[in-house]
């Protein structure tokens, strides 16, 4: 029996890295039937045990418990959740300053998911070479807000060697994930960080500035500098899953202390009297964009 990490999932076959070789493996039907609430019983990053067949292929026997993972609502009319990647040291939401435009709501949903599932998170703002007047001030303000609540923010451009070297130092010997919409440059960054992986780079539609999907399946890519990066399919929206409305504020670090002062245990932090979170917001201790993101998320959970 062999033990390894899942590097790629195409739906029916899984590439498993044992450290000595990569084995194309299948998953028995019982695993697919056991977890009906999950669209993918195995995800990239999973640690598995497998038996090797005479033809060199593998059969996955056991899926080890995950240390952490990133999940989102299933798409295309499917119910339940879709797990993007597991067993991470860190995960980064990638956005571009322009083409497509930065989406702070997406960032906040990603950060809430990371808080809920125990993943260290950070933010990468790409395509800074496209920044126009006012963009740099916007980014500086954003960096200040997110750093103050514990999230590192990195700015980069594939044209800026210094910023790429900084990312290399962050990814070195770590298992990391890149999550973001299509077109923000996730794959382009990976190509510069590790030129051995000449991954297909997608063009951004000039008519809509919304990226075309280029990475079809999630994959965990070994880096020349050591470690792995999970390159995931572009995601237009990041839907929360398995988070109750009453617990949402627990995943906003800046709300944890103020909520202790709330008069009511069931406080939603929107309209109740004696709310510590509302008081903190009105006193300027909580960023308005973050607070409004919280309200939008709460409303989506109540729908």
What spans do the regions from the language model cover?
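Canonical P-loop GTPase G-domain recognition
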Residues: 130-184
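N-terminal accessory targeting/assembly segments
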Residues: 1-104
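Helix-rich effector regions associated with P-loop NTPase G domains
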Residues: 12, 37-54, 65-84, 120-121, ...
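Conserved beta-strand/loop subsegment of P-loop NTPase cores
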Residues: 88-95, 118-128, 150-156
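Short flexible coil/turn linkers enriched for glycine and charged/polar residues
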Residues: 8-10, 54, 86-89, 117, ...
């Amino acid at each position: 029996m062999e033990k390894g990490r899942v590097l790629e999932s195409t739906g029916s076959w899984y590439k498993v890295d044992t450290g000595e070789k990569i084995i194309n493996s299948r998953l028995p039907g019982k695993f697919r039937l056991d977890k009906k609430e999950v669209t993918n019983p195995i995800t990239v990053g999973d640690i598995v045990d497998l038996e090797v067949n005479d033809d060199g292929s593998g059969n996955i026997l056991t899926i080890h418990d995950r240390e952490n993972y990133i999940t989102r609502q299933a798409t295309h009319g499917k119910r339940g959740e879709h797990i993007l990647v597991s067993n991470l040291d860190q995960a980064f939401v990638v956005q571009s300053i322009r083409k497509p435009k930065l989406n702070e709501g997406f960032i906040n949903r990603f950060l809430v998911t990371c808080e809920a599932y125990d993943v260290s998170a950070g933010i990468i703002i790409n395509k800074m070479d496209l920044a126009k007047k006012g963009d740099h001030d916007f980014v500086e303000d954003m960096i200040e807000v997110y750093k103050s609540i514990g999230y590192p923010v990195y700015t980069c451009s594939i044209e800026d060697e210094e910023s790429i070297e900084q990312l290399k130092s962050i990814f070195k010997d770590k298992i990391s994930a890149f999550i973001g919409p299509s077109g923000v440059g996730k794959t382009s960054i990976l190509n510069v960080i590790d030129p051995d992986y000449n991954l297909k780079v997608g063009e951004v539609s000039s008519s809509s500035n919304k990226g075309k999907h280029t990475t079809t399946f999630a994959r965990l890519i070994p880096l020349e500098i050591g470690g792995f990066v999970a390159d995931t399919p572009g995601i237009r929206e990041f839907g929360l899953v398995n988070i109750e409305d009453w617990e949402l504020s627990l995943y906003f670090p800046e709300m944890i202390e103020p909520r202790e002062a709330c008069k009511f245990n069931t406080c939603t932090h929107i309209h109740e009297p004696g709310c510590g979170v509302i008081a903190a917001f009105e006193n300027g201790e909580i960023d308005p964009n973050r607070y409004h993101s919280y309200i939008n998320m709460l409303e989506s959970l109540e729908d």
